[in-house]
Curated annotation (Swiss-Prot):
Keyword Transmembrane helix: yes
Any one cellular-component term (Gene Ontology): plasma membrane
Keywords from the named record: Glycoprotein, Membrane, Transmembrane, Transmembrane helix
SUPFAM superfamilies from the UniProt entry: Tetraspanin
Glycosylation sites: N229
Oxidoreductase found in the keyword field: no
Record protein name field: Photoreceptor outer segment membrane glycoprotein 2
GO BP terms, alphabetized: protein localization to plasma membrane; protein maturation; visual perception
Membrane-spanning ranges: 25-43, 62-80, 100-123, 265-290
Family: Belongs to the PRPH2/ROM1 family.
Compartments it resides in: Membrane
Topological region Lumenal: 44-61, 124-264
Length: 364
């Protein structure tokens, strides 16, 4: 039993072909949009790759870029096919190609859906990458003289200023690392040496944060050092007073930023997927309607078009059987209880012969 059968006249077939020709060109534009969105996301990730650990976070932009390029090629070809389908004589040259084209387009639209869903599922991978990357960036913040890390201080400072954040999880992360280079510490000072000896790691740890953590909107001058020491500042209570530094961690700020981008890209990709799916359904109706009109022999008459020739269950069983048969085609099968009668027969040209050769008497 056919699924969603529709009857088409000659006029309806021609209009459907023209509409699909236009929609395929619109789909080329949607492919360019997908490519642009993937490229934009890739650039945004690359901008801050210094504070991200290496991982599979580029899989989403790479998927969108690839799908966008494929969309342009597939829909350009689809536009040409639909344009020729308005003429039954031209359709005959595409007749054998249209069904494989529809199958490939279905797989391609599935990739669009997969790319859209990946925009919503990569949050955990992104969060882990940001956590590890920011942890290392804060750890190496002081290494301004080491090649490969000399610009890391500027990167972290610009990040904290731009995203109004401080530390990885919060400003307390700076309390746990030595973020002041030993080059700028007076080793002859007793206070400095006491700082080094005050912890088992032998690091210069202070309850302070870099200047980039300061909130310029605060009416009070930035309290950058001795944040937990109330007696070090006039009219200051660490527990009750609102601090004039950024409280939000940079991991949370970056995660919110990238999540908002990926959510918008995911919505756009889903809308493009629905549009591509509707175009694919239209192409399927056009293919079946043109195929049936050729079988009838009356190019001006009516013809039926459908989504599936059989029911969903029958179509699924048919495709599964095709896949099974393809797997069995690579295996050598033998009939049960029967052996090849020639399997143990020796070749007469191989090995030594036991027959004694007789000499031929010479003619007298």
């Amino acid at each position: 039993m056919t699924v969603l059968k529709v009857k088409f006249t000659k006029t309806k077939r021609d209009k459907l072909a023209q509409i699909l020709w236009i929609l395929n060109w619109v789909s080329v534009v949607s492919g360019i949009i997908l490519f642009s969105l993937g490229l934009f996301l890739k650039i945004e990730i690359k901008k801050r790759n210094e504070v991200m650990a290496k991982g599979d976070i580029n899989s989403v932009p790479n998927m969108l870029i690839s799908v966008g390029v494929i969309a342009c090629v597939v829909n350009f070809l689809g536009g040409k096919i639909c344009y020729d389908c308005s003429d039954a004589n031209k359709f005959s040259r595409w007749k054998l190609i249209m069904l494989p084209y529809i199958i490939c387009t279905f797989c391609f639209t599935f990739c669009i859906l997969l790319g859209a869903l990946m925009c919503y599922t990569m949050r955990n991978e992104l969060e882990e990458s940001l956590y590890l990357g920011l942890r290392d960036a804060i750890k190496f913040y002081k290494d301004t003289d080491i090649p490969g890390r000399c610009f890391l201080k500027k990167t972290v400072d610009m990040l904290q200023i731009g995203f109004q954040c401080c530390g990885n999880n919060g400003f307390r992360d700076w309390f746990e690392v030595q973020w002041v280079s030993a080059r700028y510490l007076n080793m002859a000072s007793k206070e400095v040496m006491d700082r080094f000896k005050s912890n088992v790691d032998g690091k210069f740890l202070v309850d302070g944060v870099p200047f980039s953590c300061c909130n310029p909107s605060s009416p009070r001058p930035c309290i950058q050092y001795h944040l937990t020491n109330n007696s070090a500042h006039y009219n200051y209570d660490f527990l009750t007073e609102e601090l004039n530094i950024w409280v939000k961690g940079c991991r949370e700020a970056l995660l919110e930023y990238y999540t908002a981008i990926m959510r918008s890209i995911g919505i756009a990709a889903l809308l493009i997927w629905l549009f591509e799916l509707s175009v694919l359904i239209g192409v399927r109706y056009l293919q079946t309607a043109m195929k049936n009109v050729l079988l009838q022999g009356d190019l001006q008459g009516e013809s039926d078009g459908w989504l599936l020739e059989n029911s969903f269950v029958e179509t699924a069983k048919y495709n599964i059987n095709i896949i099974k048969n393809l797997g069995k085609a690579n295996q050598i099968s033998t009939v049960s209880g029967m052996n090849d009668p020639n399997i143990n027969v020796q070749n007469t040209n191989c090995g030594k012969s036991n027959v004694t050769a007789k000499s031929i008497p010479a003619a007298s």
